[in-house]
Amino acid sequence: AEAASEKLSDRSEADKLKAACEVSKAVCASLVKEKKTAAPPKLFDLTSLQREANRLFGYTAKQTLDLAQALYEKRLLTYPRTDSAFLTDDMGDTAAGIIKLLCGKFSFMAGKDFTPELGKVLNSKKVSDHHAIIPTMELAKTDLATLPESERNILTLAGARLLMATAAVHTFEAVTATFECAGQSFTAKGKTVLYDGWKEIDRRYRAALKNKPETDDADSDTEKTLPPFTEGQTFENPTAKVTEHDTTPPKP
């Protein structure tokens, strides 16, 4: 496991600390474990579809709207000009049928036993004029390979989001370990996945894309899995290294 000290602005000071650590012992001073969950993402409204299509494929907002409109006119996607991220309460059976269809159509769902939690996406009170953007049952009559790649990207993106939105929560244990070495504190962060939930579908979907985008998880700094530690555990002559990082200004 890697543990980092606080930032040091002086390179020579960092080099001295590195040398001191390598002839010292590191002690696990504290170990904090916290069970956390990450809820599935919501279904797409137009704005969130445009944002995600830009992140994954580089499409502009207008390109995404035009592609979604073309799919709507082919009856493969529901009405795209919506500000709702939910389906109406009476759409449970429809959504279940579409999800079953998607599991058979999408190669990245092969071998995945999936039972949707439909209650997460049904809420008539949060639907005004039009419900969230999802594929339609017309997809059953369509070979995805015959669609233009850009349209296929949008349709698959909307379908993958329906699967993720109805999947189980992602449950993990966040671990923060603090070590003392050569008079300096070092911190290591990691996670232990308890139940993968919707993130397994997210990984499967991203792995199937031509260009593999990085996850945009807010908890990406805790993605590493740490080996088991106990408080008071010691490590003789730990390996140390100095790394340089550019500071980034705060976002406005």
Predicted feature residues:
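Core catalytic DNA strand-manipulation module of type IA topoisomerases
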Residues: A1-P252
